[in-house]
Amino acid sequence: MKYLYVLLLGGLLSCNAQNLEKSESKPNIIYINVDDLGWMDTETYGSTFYETPNINKLAESGLKFTNGYASAANCAPSRACLISGQNTPRHGIYTVSNSDRGNEKTRKIIPIKNTEILADNNITIAEMLKQEGYITGTFGKWHLGEDPKTQGFDVNVGGAKHGNPGKDGFFSPYNIKNIVDNKKGENLTDRLTQEAISFIKEHKEKPFFLYLPYYAVHTPLSTTNALEQKYKEKGGNPFQNKAVYAGMIETVDRNIGLILDEIKALNLKNTLIVFTSDNGGIRAISHQDPLRAGKGSYYEGGIRVPYIISWDGVVKPNTVSKTPITNLDFYPTFMDILNVENLNKIVDGTSILPILKGKTINDRSLFFHFPIYLQAYNFKIDDGRDPFFRTRPGSVIIDGDWKLHQYFENNEIELYNLKTDLGERNNLVDVHPEKVAALLKKLKSWRTEINAPIPTELNPKYEANFVPKKFKKK
């Protein structure tokens, strides 16, 4: 009898160990990707105007990264990096629409042609997870083609090529494809969340990948009268004071709370939750000081974004990491969690699973490549490099405390120490020539390795002294 008890106990322990191993290897994954949310646009990251109690709660349950980056400074390329696990030169998506943005007489060189749709033969993060037995669903902005169901998603609500919901599109009747109107006046963020919750309930018995790329808080800004009035009465500060935008953030936060409540109600403890933004915020809407510039710029305001990761039993609650990460890191991280090896594709980024478990990863450089033009919003507000463009063709390397910008038009260099100058105001290119040389060598080596295209052909229509009419003083 005693021998039988030992056998039974051993079997139970073995089963429990196997179940634990299986549980950790196949967590549910929820990736919340807010559109155009700036680094400073939540209470968690220092805002005193926007109210985000549920995002605070998520941070208290998990790990907050203070040096997180999007892999590109605007919507489509950042999303392509996340979904493909590859940096921009590999998938060729550098911006939204055409690459020759701005007035042609202000562009000194001819930019590299932009790719607008993620190639069907690129094995996406959803396809990789499907191969591992996951049910996959996306609820919101896709922006990489007409239908994410052709690229690994079993369920798609609201995802198409649209970059924003259009005029009055945050309330039903909707302007976007792949969503059916319910009652008039329904809020799009609310609807996407309810669809996501239905997906969770339906697939709670199997591992699921829930991609929740809200259209909010992208323009056109829109909220309820009640929320707008609330934040008008609250008032803000010179940097954050847009009541409608604040209402949109509160709506996103409330809906994140509903997701967290559902996970708790269903006791889905083995759920990895990521909260982030696709790029920096639009400076005319919300400043990210001390960061310089905003969406579309490769200064910190355009690429530094919030990251919060929660995973019960794995990620230690209420912790902070200063390790730099990017959205390129999640594809290899999910592969690492699932022990996926032979994927038959190159994946950039680094697994951050050791960080989630309280360990460290090796130091590495981060690279950004933007061989095209992106016109300015409003130079008086953009806080950019020149009046005509948010950024001109160039590359960036971040290596430890150091950040180097190289611009292709004139081979101009900017060097900043982010530890002492997070706002990128003090160009140290003449002070540290040895650091410039070392970083340029790394940057050029990376571009060669990844086969990054560099524009060199001069634009015959360029006029050095030309000033577009809207920039001329009246």
Where are these regions (language model features)?
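Formylglycine-dependent sulfatase
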Residues: 2, 15-409, 413-414, 422-442, ...
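Sec-dependent N-terminal signal peptides
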Residues: 3-12
